[in-house]
Amino acid sequence: MDTLVAIPFAWYRYSGQSLHYAFIKIGNVTVNLGLNLLFLLYFPFLENKGYRLPLMELVSDKTQYIFLANLIASLLTFIYMLPLYKRIGFLWDIALWKRLFQYAFPVLIAGIAFSINEAFDRVFIRMLYPASLADAVVGLYAGCYKMGVFMTLFITAYKLGVEPFFFSNAADKNAPQTYAKVTEYFSIFAGGILLFVCVYIDLFKWLLIPNRAYWEGLKIVPFVLMANLCLGLYHSLSVWYKVTDRTHWGAIISLIGGGITIVANLSLIPLWGYMGAAVATFLAYGGMMLLSLWIGQRKYPIPYPWQRIGSFLLLSTGLSLAYFYIGDRNLFVGSTAVVGYAFLAYKSVKRVKNEK
């Protein structure tokens, strides 16, 4: 079902109907969440009261309820999309199909490599730690990794919005300058998120990590955030191979990133424990970002203002690491740094807007 609605969702993004896109996505999540609450909380309540619904007789394992909720939400989304299918119509074009396959197959390979980057840190932690500790350490690591959700949400929203924008401007003679400006905006805001989360992490931990036993693992958070920032920059820098139909480069870069993930985890976890896994993720995404930049500037030069971008990234990273690892995490000092960064970001964004 999710595959069948991929093209309609892409059409909404391409046509700039971001509100409609968001409405459907939020509706899907709301239905899914509501059904999970119904199945996993209300149904057991009814069962304890002696009520048995027909659906309860068909489900033997509670995990089946999760699958069922997802299936119903996806089915409703597909039904909602049906009028769009009728409006667009169907036309089989073998030449277009070949072009789509040539473009999309490397993206599929890149997606597999991305899954390696995202999941193998836990695999290696479990493999390299003693069996008696592995489950507890993976739980601690995964619990603290959730603090990267702020950067992840920003990157996801950015990627969903920026890719249709990149393609719609590909034919414009000023496209490289536009891409450079968008990347500068991303760098400024992503740097702000990095600093903000690092400064207020002792407040966020109460919300996202209720298990106090996991708090000792918060030391991984700056590297998780920096890794996600590098991933976001990679998505922005990867415009060159997407708009020029050279997606095989995306597969190559992602596979290299997967290789870095494997080697770095095997090397660093025995030295630094689960902290090594977070550093490995940062090295993998950082390597992919730099590789995409290096190759891209030779294949499709874009005039990125690296002096300004680098200044904000260095400022944000330096302040975040110093506050988190060197200082005593004084909230007043951290808040002053956040306000100072916000002021500089405001001035820079205002200046970039006024540039022609």
Residue ranges of predicted features:
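Membrane-interface junctions at transmembrane-helix termini in multi-pass inner-membrane proteins
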Residues: 2-26, 85-88, 225-256, 298
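Helix-loop interface residues and adjacent transmembrane-helix termini in multi-pass membrane transporters
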Residues: 14-15, 59-60, 132, 169, ...
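Residue-level signature of transmembrane alpha-helical cores of multipass secondary-active transporters
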Residues: 21, 25, 66-70, 74, ...
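Hydrophobic alpha-helical transmembrane segments
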Residues: 22-85, 255-261, 274-294, 337-344
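Interhelical loop/hinge segments that connect adjacent transmembrane helices in multipass membrane
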Residues: 47-65, 69, 78-118, 161, ...
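Interfacial/gating helices of multi-pass transporter permease domains
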Residues: 59-63, 99-103, 107, 125-149, ...
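Specific pore-lining/lateral-gate transmembrane helices of multi-pass inner-membrane transport
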Residues: 140-254
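Membrane-proximal transmembrane or re-entrant/amphipathic helices at the cytosolic face
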Residues: 322-356
